[in-house]
Amino acid sequence: EIFRQYSNEGALYFSDDFELSDELKVNAGLRYSSFQHRGDINLFTYLKNDLTLSNDNYRNIEPRLSLRYKLNTTSSIKGSYSENYQYIHLASTSSVSLPTDLWVPSSTGIKPKFAKQYALGYFKNFNDNMFETSLEGYYKEMTNLIEYREGYLPEDNTNSSSDDSFTFGDGDSYGIEVLLKKNRGKTTGWIGYTLSKTTRYFDEVNNGIEFPAKYDRRHDLSIT
């Protein structure tokens, strides 16, 4: 037997730029997303082909807004806010990394992941734009996250689409990003460093105490 799940997803996006003054520019956008889960379970055997249909539909509006305030000819402040729905979840265990982690579509029992993100940064160029520097902070809050219940292994769910396999919770992520970029000369490239923290909160995991996300990376240094 092979169990499969199917879904359709589509989106429309609109955005526009507004110059409110010589110093202040705004970009506003709106994304409309639609998701349909087609079939709770598709069961194929040598003798029978059964299809159980589901009419789980999600339609959401996702606003985005960014602002840029020019301090002078070489420096500016930028801020942004965005909302995002994710309809496909990566179901994993918090304790171990296994190659059997599964992508699971939203359904009646599994709501779409929802995230809000805020960002604010300072940007400055030097030597006639030869060098670019920036310091940016961000905060992201997430709801409707999923993980396997404690004591439940992903391979136990390989032949089942039961929503009872999962537990649901929230999370957040925040950090500071520093970037130095050289645009001209014999040597070009950039150096970036990120200090961040990503946590999860599940009532049924770790006794309800917050814990680091599976893919939390406290320090990240990139050189190109």
For the regions a language model picked out, list residue spans one by one.
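Gram-negative outer-membrane beta-barrel transporters
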Residues: D22, Y139-E141, N159-T224
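Transmembrane beta-barrel strands of outer-membrane/channel proteins
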Residues: A28-S34, G79-E83, D101, Y122, ...
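Extracellular loop and loop/strand-boundary signature of outer-membrane beta-barrel proteins
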Residues: E1-I2, S15, Y46-S54, L102-T108, ...
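Residues on the lipid-exposed face of transmembrane beta-strands in outer-membrane beta-barrel proteins
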Residues: L12-D16, L65-Y69, I110, L120-K124, ...
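Outer-membrane beta-barrel channels and translocator barrels
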Residues: S21-K25, K70-T74, A115, F126-N129, ...
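Membrane-embedded beta-barrel scaffold of Gram-negative outer-membrane proteins
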Residues: K70, S76-S82, Q86-I88, S92, ...
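Signature of Gram-negative outer-membrane beta-barrel scaffolds
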Residues: E1-N72, Y87-I88, V205
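Outer-membrane beta-barrel translocator domains and adjoining extracellular loop/strand segments
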Residues: E1, R38-L47, L90-L98, W103, ...
